[in-house]
């Protein structure tokens, strides 16, 4: 096989592997951002965090109705505690994603 073709195939394989690893890392981060409370599942994202912030900004911290991932209503009775739980989970997972992403970039070397 021609040397340049061999190098090109090797490069393509390394790049494909790297892209697959990044894709898996993103999926893992999304899966880890799931919070279960009161028998309901919430995917923690910036929309949910901002909704809590909005409620807290208008001083509605005692209770509010939220829709879970399955669009079922659930009454959250302590918005501050819920907000602390979701932001903590989100930040831990984002930090883990950051560390693992940087490790992948470091390990990939010269692609």
Label every model-predicted segment.
Residues 1-111:
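A preference for well-ordered globular domain cores
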């Amino acid at each position: 096989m021609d040397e340049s073709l061999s190098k090109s195939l090797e490069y393509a394989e390394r790049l494909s592997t790297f892209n697959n690893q990044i894709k898996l890392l993103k999926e893992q981060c999304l899966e880890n951002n799931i919070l279960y409370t009161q028998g309901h599942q919430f995917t923690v994202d910036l929309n949910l965090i901002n909704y809590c912030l909005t409620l807290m900004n208008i001083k509605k911290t005692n209770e509010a109705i939220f829709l879970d991932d399955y669009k079922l209503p659930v009454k959250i009775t302590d918005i501050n505690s819920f907000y602390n739980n979701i932001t903590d989970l989100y930040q831990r997972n984002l930090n883990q994603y950051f560390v693992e992403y940087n490790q992948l970039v470091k390990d990939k070397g010269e692609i």
